[in-house]
Curated annotation (Swiss-Prot):
Gene name in the database record: rplM
Stated name of the protein: Large ribosomal subunit protein uL13
Keywords: Ribonucleoprotein, Ribosomal protein
Described function: This protein is one of the early assembly proteins of the 50S ribosomal subunit, although it is not seen to bind rRNA by itself. It is important during the early stages of 50S assembly.
InterPro entries to which the protein is assigned, alphabetical: Ribosomal_uL13, Ribosomal_uL13_bac-type, Ribosomal_uL13_sf
GO terms assigned for molecular function: mRNA binding; structural constituent of ribosome
GO biological process, one term: negative regulation of translation
C-alpha cells in the first residue's frame, strides 16, 4: 500500500470558534495550534498547510495559573541598543489580551515558513463579538481540568 499524499485540492478547511473565558492560556494555545496545523485530520502532512481557521473570542477573560500574572514577562526589542522592554502578563492582559493569546499560540507552532501561513488563519477578538458569522463556525470545546 502506498503512502497517501494530499493534494492542494483535497484540503477541506473548516471554521472553529473557541470561547476563551476561564480557559488556561497554555491549554488554549496547544489545542488551537493543533487545529491551525491540521494535526486533528487523518490526512495531515507536515509539509503542507492543512489547518483550519480558528476564531478565539473573549481573549480578555483567559486564565493563567499560579503566580504567572505577576511573575511571567513578555519581552520585545526595538532593534536599538538598550531597546529591550518587558511587561508582566497582568499588564499585558489588561492592555492587549489579543497579543498575549497570539504570542502563546505562535510559540507552539513550528519555526518554519509554514507557521506564517498557519498563523494567518487565527482570528483573536477581545470581546464576544466577531465578524465571521457568514462562515458558520462550529463551536470547539476546550477540554478543561478543574483549577
Amino acid at each position: 500500500m502506498r503512502t497517501y499524499t494530499p493534494k492542494p485540492g483535497d484540503i477541506n478547511r473548516q471554521w472553529h470558534v473557541i470561547d476563551a473565558t476561564d480557559v488556561v492560556l497554555g491549554r488554549l494555545a496547544s489545542q488551537t495550534a493543533t487545529l491551525l496545523r491540521g494535526k486533528h485530520k487523518p490526512t495531515f502532512a507536515p509539509h503542507m498547510d492543512m489547518g483550519d481557521f480558528v476564531i478565539i473570542i473573549n481573549a480578555e477573560k483567559v486564565a493563567l495559573t499560579g503566580a504567572k500574572l505577576e511573575q511571567k514577562r513578555a519581552y520585545r526589542h526595538s532593534g536599538y541598543p538598550g531597546g529591550l522592554s518587558s511587561v508582566n502578563y497582568a499588564e499585558l492582559l489588561e492592555k492587549n489580551p489579543v497579543r498575549a493569546v497570539e504570542k502563546a499560540i505562535k510559540g507552539m507552532l513550528p519555526k518554519t515558513s509554514l507557521a506564517a501561513q498557519q498563523l494567518s488563519k487565527l482570528k483573536v477578538y477581545r470581546g464576544a463579538e466577531h465578524p465571521h458569522a457568514a462562515q458558520q463556525p462550529k463551536t470547539f470545546e476546550i477540554t478543561q481540568v478543574a483549577q
